């Protein structure tokens, strides 16, 4: 049986792994075995943090809405309940943007929600 040389295939695989970990420090960007471990960990972190980002932004939107709503002596839960009962199709992201960028519009939305119920 003839000998199969895999130098080209192995080098190609190694270069692909090293390219993934190009920004890492020390051996994680130079040696294949630590680089492979680092690449696996990096991909796991990025997968986890894609879902975490959604959660974090929702927390941020809620905090912004809560801070703005408290100025009008209404709690966050009361404000969300009033907005939903008044059949306004505004989600938390929209409300947070309005609260940050245009406070008077947010005030009119809140008063409309209060008086419509």
From Swiss-Prot:
Keyword NAD attributed: no
Locations listed in the record: Plastid, Chloroplast
GO CC annotations, alphabetized: chloroplast; ribonucleoprotein complex; ribosome
Transmembrane segments: none
SUPFAM superfamilies: Ribosomal protein L20 (SSF74731)
Disulfide bonding pattern of the chain: none
Family matches, as Pfam families: Ribosomal_L20
GO molecular function annotations of the record: rRNA binding; structural constituent of ribosome
Primary localization: plastid
Keywords: Chloroplast, Plastid, Ribonucleoprotein, Ribosomal protein, RNA-binding, rRNA-binding
UniProt superkingdom: Eukaryota
Keyword RNA-binding belongs to the record: yes
InterPro entries named in the record: Ribosomal_bL20 (IPR005813), RIBOSOMAL_L20_CS (IPR049946), Ribosomal_protein_bL20_C (IPR035566)
Biological process according to GO: ribosomal large subunit assembly; translation
Family statement drawn from the similarity comment of this UniProt entry: Belongs to the bacterial ribosomal protein bL20 family.
Physiological role: Binds directly to 23S ribosomal RNA and is necessary for the in vitro assembly process of the 50S ribosomal subunit. It is not involved in the protein synthesizing functions of that subunit.
Protein name: Large ribosomal subunit protein bL20c
Organism: Zygnema circumcarinatum (Green alga)
